[in-house]
Design a protein with these regions (language model features):
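Alpha-helical transmembrane segments of polytopic membrane proteins
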Residues: 40, 49-60, 113-123, 165-175
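N-terminal topogenic module of multi-pass integral membrane proteins
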Residues: 1-76
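Terminal transmembrane helical module of multi-pass membrane proteins
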Residues: 131-182
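Aromatic-anchored segments of alpha-helical transmembrane domains
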Residues: 22, 92-99, 147-157
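Membrane-proximal helix-loop-helix units in multi-pass membrane proteins
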Residues: 90-134
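Juxtamembrane "helix-exit" motif on the non-cytosolic side of transmembrane helices
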Residues: 26-27, 73-75, 101-107, 133, ...
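Hydrophobic residues within the alpha-helical transmembrane core of Major Facilitator Superfamily
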Residues: 23, 64-67, 98, 128, ...
Length: 182
């Protein structure tokens, strides 16, 4: 499989696993007003093992394939030190993605949220710096939408939980779309 095809896999995995996890969420809990759960929310005090493994395996694969991108694709010409720093930060972000998958929101909220939002922030930071040196309008738009989604998530969650969760999902979707389009 060539590198361009590998870069497409995380978005496809994210879409399929999200659909499956939302389905499991709605079939495994009492009815509430939550239509769009947070990405990793199973809605149970006792973890649904099927949901847990789908989530963990999907973020394990996403983290590993994204780390492949940082190691093989991320480059800033004539800035080898900056490239190495960004690659390292990107790898840390990928590790945090794997940690977030291992520790579910329902049972390890603090660890999960620190690793999830820390990973998102580091990915956005690395890709924003990379785009500063490698202007690509399509990717600038996508990363800007990801930044906007994560910045609006908090205020939107106070208005309506479903809208906040939608913005959280959009942020990750746009990050993976950028990798897909790379």
């Amino acid at each position: 499989m060539n590198q361009n095809n590998i870069n497409k896999v995380p978005l496809i995995i994210y879409i399929f696993s999200s659909i499956i996890l939302v389905y499991i969420f709605h079939n495994s809990r009492s009815k509430t007003g939550i239509i769009i759960p947070q990405i990793s929310q199973t809605g149970m005090k006792i973890i649904n093992k099927k949901a847990y493994y789908i989530y963990f395996i999907s973020f394990l694969i996403i983290g590993l394939l994204a780390s492949n991108f940082y190691l093989k694709e991320l480059n800033i010409k004539k800035k080898s030190t900056l490239t190495k720093i960004l690659q390292f930060i990107g790898l840390v972000a990928c590790f945090l993605n794997i940690v977030q998958g291992y520790y579910p929101l329902d049972t390890h909220k603090k660890i999960h949220e620190i690793s999830a939002y820390g990973g998102i922030f580091l990915h956005l930071l690395v890709l924003s710096v990379w785009l500063y040196y490698n202007r690509r309008k399509d990717l600038i738009t996508i990363i800007s939408l990801s930044w906007l989604s994560i910045l609006l998530m908090g205020p939107m969650r106070t208005i309506n939980f479903n809208i906040g969760s939608l913005f959280q999902r959009l942020c990750v979707f746009f990050l993976l779309l950028a990798l897909y389009m790379y």
